[in-house]
Amino acid sequence: MRAGNRRHLVIPRTRTLILALCLAACSQAAQAPWPDVRYEPSPPEVVTAMLELAAVGPRDVVYDLGCGDGRIVIEAARRYGARGVCVDIDPERIAEARNNAAAAGLVERITFRQEDLLVTELGRASVVTLFLSPDMNLRLRPRLQLELASGARIVSHWHDMGDWRPDRTRAVWDGKRSRQLFLWVKR
């Protein structure tokens, strides 16, 4: 075969290979879990107020849905002796939460779940903390009402749950602005 003919075979094969690699990369990206809510950590003053509002104690199991760096569950374990479950779809956030719990010496009191908070099992939670979005709170609401035991507390930073009236609200000053907290007690 002449050199010119080989060149005509190499170029289409190279293009095909590049196209196949691009399609594989796009397919991987499409399958990777991606958070529905942008990560923004709750300031320390808000974390403290959320746990106080929920009246967290040593018998509680605190679930933080969309846990980010794990600060709420870590503080519940450190300050109140509670157990906790950190749930986040983002593997980097779960790794960060696990590392922070290990640094605090609390990893044995906390379970870490890299999964979609819309499908995570909630039945063991006595307290659920949220800093999500109005839409995500509304999507979670039926599951919270169905799966949580009577007396369970739900505390949301910033967002309510539509026409489900909170049992209490609290404004917290974080040094820059006032932030609203909502508490519901499951009946």
Language-model regions, residue ranges each:
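Conserved SAM-binding motif I beta-strand of class I
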Residues: R83-D88
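Bacterial N-terminal signal peptides
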Residues: R15-A25
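Conserved class I S-adenosyl-L-methionine
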Residues: R59-G68
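S-adenosyl-L-methionine
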Residues: C26-D60, P91-R124
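C-terminal substrate-binding/active-site "lid" region of AdoMet-derived donor-dependent transferases
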Residues: D135-R187
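A short SAM/SAH-binding and catalytic strip from SAM-dependent methyltransferases
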Residues: G123-R139
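Glycine-rich SAM-binding Motif I of class I
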Residues: G70-I74
